[in-house]
Amino acid sequence: MKKLSTALVAATAALAMMAEGYQVNTFSAKQEGMGHVGVAMKLGAESQIFNPGALSFMNKTMEVSGAMSAIKATAKADVDGTGYETSNKVSTPMNFSAAFRIYDNLYAGVTLYTPYGSSINWGKSWPGAVLNQSCDLKVFTVQPTVSWRILPKLSVGAGLMISWGSVDLKKGLVPASSMDKLVNLQYEAAMLQYKAAQLAAMIPGTPAPGEAPVKTGYTYGNMPPASVGLKGNSELALGFNIGAMYDITDKWTVGASFRSKMEMKVKAGDASVEYADEMARATLGSTLDNLNYANFSAQMPCPYVLTAGVAYKPIERLTLAFDAQLNGWGTYKNLDIEFAGLEAYNQHLEKNYKNAMTYHLGGQFAMTE
């Protein structure tokens, strides 16, 4: 009989995402409701993502599943007592999985999912604009998987991750404070010229100077006078996903999995420069417009993920699960953006992320047999 289950949410996705950066864990609606647990659970075709070793515990000849989530996240920042908030669009992480039996103890499958991605929009004018105004990052992975149940209670599995993605990043290119200083220097230089002309006018036959330059008092505030848009597609990246599962008893199951690090590399992305106003264009355009005709290269990591967990069935219809996950963000030291033939404009952005632990606790109750 088809089972009807309800999730007992014990750890929310929001808490997990704080330490997961641009990692995506919303691989199925069921697991999202359960706080993203899954490494010690027998999830059928979806096990290819959470723990490839669990796939060979599938009790069907063939299974196909799919899920899509709609996420609208919000981030806030407080800078010197002023609050700032993102205006993000809806993101739609998804997965589609299919698996089939080869032998009673050998299963294979393939899954398509989005392990990493981010959509954030701080707007053009905020104190961190020179680092990030907006970013739309997408990573897709196709993973063929094989799982072998070595013993009745022990199974292992492995999958080859074939990944590609795209990035659309906008950031300030020139700090607003630098432009304010430049405008002030231009005014002071104009005043020196005007005063020199006044002195020269004291000599008979020398024409009087025109009107004195006027200091507008205008400042760019948090608005970078020039911003750069970077858009590109990554090359294929390869990684692996391995896992194991063991039934200690009929009630207790343990599992572990490891997804390797991948480097997403853009080798020939497109750059475009946008100016805050005509004064910025007139002042900076002759220097920065060359970027509109340059390609950029960059790379960023999809860090490794090590997960271990336990599942417990206190009664037949109730399953409780706990996962501990180590996210290898320590591999993200910096982001280097290099422009072909225009090395003077290369960007070196320090990241220095730290490894982070996340903990997931959830459960489900089967309402029917």
Where are these regions (language model features)?
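Gram-negative bacterial Sec-dependent N-terminal signal peptides
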Residues: 1-19
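N-terminal, post-signal-peptide region of Sec/Tat-exported proteins
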Residues: 45-71
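Hydrophobic alpha-helical membrane context
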Residues: 14-15, 63, 155
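N-terminal targeting signals for Sec/Tat export/insertion, comprising classic cleavable signal peptides
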Residues: 31-48
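Enrichment for repetitive, rod-forming helical segments
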Residues: 9-10, 37, 266
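Outer-membrane beta-barrel porins/channels
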Residues: 20-33, 60, 77-85, 91-369
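Short strand-turn segments of transmembrane beta-barrel domains in outer membranes
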Residues: 36-39, 63-76, 83
